[in-house]
């Protein structure tokens, strides 16, 4: 998804959304440039293969240049991963990822607008939206969360806080006088 009209913190403009086909567990990677997609995709694939001790059978994507290049094709061939492309100009064939994009984007928009946050925080809102979806959204067929299907354990959400809610950081290493504030006010981003 991208490029974003407003850059996020760190100059980020693009979003790579990766969805596991069975569990619908989702990963988002915020990118500065579209040219980073291949390296980030390869890194994520290697990480997931080590984490789950599996080989990725298939990568499905559109015909974007970032997916249809020699580096990713070579990686897929080396790993024994089949690379499949959807027909050009048919986003409905990639419905799962397209729908995730929309849902994550809408959630992020609500989070930012609810607290009147600057649009430059969209990257943090996107990450929070994805994390929240993975932890609370139920897979219809199994009645389990995406997190539970992917990780094999129940998701814990008691640590969740409202996006941009007030928080306080302790100033314990500073030389404070008797009546100085012992904390600084901030807000939670995720």
Regions found by a protein language model. Give the residues of each.
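Anionic group-binding determinants
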Residues: 1-190
């Amino acid at each position: 998804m991208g490029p974003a009209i407003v850059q996020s913190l760190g100059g980020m403009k693009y979003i790579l959304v990766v969805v596991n086909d069975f569990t619908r567990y989702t990963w988002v990677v915020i990118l500065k440039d579209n040219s980073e997609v291949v390296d980030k995709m390869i890194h994520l694939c290697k990480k997931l293969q080590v984490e789950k001790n599996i080989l990725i059978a298939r990568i499905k994507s559109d015909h974007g240049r970032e997916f249809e290049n020699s580096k990713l094709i070579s990686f897929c061939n080396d790993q024994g991963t089949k690379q499949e492309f959807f027909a050009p100009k048919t986003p409905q064939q990639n419905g799962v990822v397209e729908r995730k994009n929309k849902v994550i984007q809408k959630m992020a928009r609500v989070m930012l607008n609810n607290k009147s946050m600057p649009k430059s925080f969209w990257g943090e809102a996107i990450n929070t939206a994805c994390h929240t979806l993975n932890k609370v959204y139920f897979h219809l067929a199994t009645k389990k969360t995406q997190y539970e299907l992917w990780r094999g354990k129940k998701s814990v959400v008691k640590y969740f806080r409202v996006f941009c809610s007030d928080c306080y950081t302790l100033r314990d290493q500073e030389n404070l006088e008797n009546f100085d504030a012992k904390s600084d006010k901030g807000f939670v981003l995720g």
